[in-house]
Design a protein with these regions (language model features):
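Accessory "access/gating" subregions that flank catalytic or transport cores
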Residues: 1, 158, 163, 171, ...
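Ferredoxin-type iron-sulfur electron-transfer modules in oxidoreductases and energy-metabolism complexes
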Residues: 11, 21-23, 47-48, 52, ...
Length: 311
């Protein structure tokens, strides 16, 4: 066994369309702390970090206060509740880089280095923070731990599908009447999220497309709206569940323009370490911009596909 071990909570919620972790941090910071305590106890970890997005400075004050309250009650510190178990948790604010949402880039940043991904293997569980074994999970995952411990794994697994167990927090944004965060059972039809929970399309327009898992996953056309919201169903449809951010696009939108806006974000946020991403995003932007300006050619489609395959 290798010690010390570390727990890192990934609260660097930077994927466009995603805001579920922010709401958990804002409204129930002690749920996250409880989940981190349970995880640390199970894995014999004595030091935990909450790596928060740089723009979450207001939430860092809330989190620091909650940690102080937990220490005052004896839930953090030395010999917690007389068990001989020691644990302290610290917050750390990033500098706003999108790439630090990737676990190994987050670890580099937490160590004071450049926010760039590491080669894998070794994986963080073997060689993570300070080259020691590290458990790294996001806010939502750690917040589910207390429920599973209290109610039992069978109860949690009774929700969802055969391969996608439990529930999922989904951030619904875009052209809906009631954007927000909704907790659903895995396997719920995407149409249920859009038309029931989120109130339907704004101005009673028609659905044109939707991005089911944050801006980095492929968008789907409107005729796929009944796809169950779970890992295997979305994968079969040609996309991913991703970060759990459902972005709804109505028929007032030019999809080419939307694509250009998304590419511009990734072009700006590329950390520059890997050539396919660094150069590919710029070429994608230039080509799609030409199409947007009515200067496109049929051969551009093949070129775009070739660049995407290489990326």
């Amino acid at each position: 066994d290798v010690f010390p071990r570390y727990l890192c909570c990934n609260a660097d919620e930077s994927e466009p369309g995603t805001c579920k972790d922010r709401e958990l941090l804002l409204k129930n910071p002690h749920l996250l702390i409880e989940g981190m305590i349970l995880c640390s106890y199970a894995c014999r970890i004595e030091t935990g970090y909450i790596y928060m997005r740089g723009e979450f400075q207001d939430l860092s004050f809330i989190m620091d206060k909650a940690l102080e309250e937990a220490r005052a009650k004896g839930y953090l510190g030395k010999n917690i509740l007389g068990t001989g178990f020691n644990l302290d948790i610290h917050t750390h604010l990033g500098a706003g880089a999108y790439i630090c949402g990737e676990e190994s880039a987050l670890l580099n940043s937490l160590e004071g280095g450049r926010g760039e991904p590491r080669m894998k293997p070794p994986f963080p569980a073997v060689e993570g923070l300070y080259s020691k074994p590290t458990v790294i999970n996001n806010v939502e995952t750690l917040c589910v731990v207390p429920y599973i411990v209290n109610e039992g794994v069978e109860k949690y697994a009774s929700f969802g599908t055969e391969k996608s167990k439990g529930t999922k927090l989904v951030s619904v944004s875009g052209h809906v009447k009631k954007p927000g965060n909704y907790e659903i059972e895995m396997g719920t039809p995407t149409s249920e999220l859009i038309y029931n929970l989120a109130g339907g399309i704004r101005n009673d327009n028609k659905l044109k497309a939707f991005i089911p898992g944050g801006s980095s996953v492929p968008m789907l056309p409107a005729d796929k709206v009944d796809t169950p919201y779970d890992y295997e169903s979305l994968a079969a449809a040609g996309t991913m569940l991703g970060s759990g951010a459902l972005i709804v696009i109505d028929d007032s939108v030019n999809i080419v323009e939307t694509t250009l806006r998304l590419i511009s974000f990734y072009m700006h946020e590329s950390c520059g370490k890997c050539t396919p991403c660094r150069e590919g995003t710029r070429w994608l932007y230039q080509i799609v911009e030409r199409i947007m300006q009515n200067n496109g050619q049929l051969e551009y489609i093949e070129k775009l596909e070739d660049i995407c395959d290489n990326m």
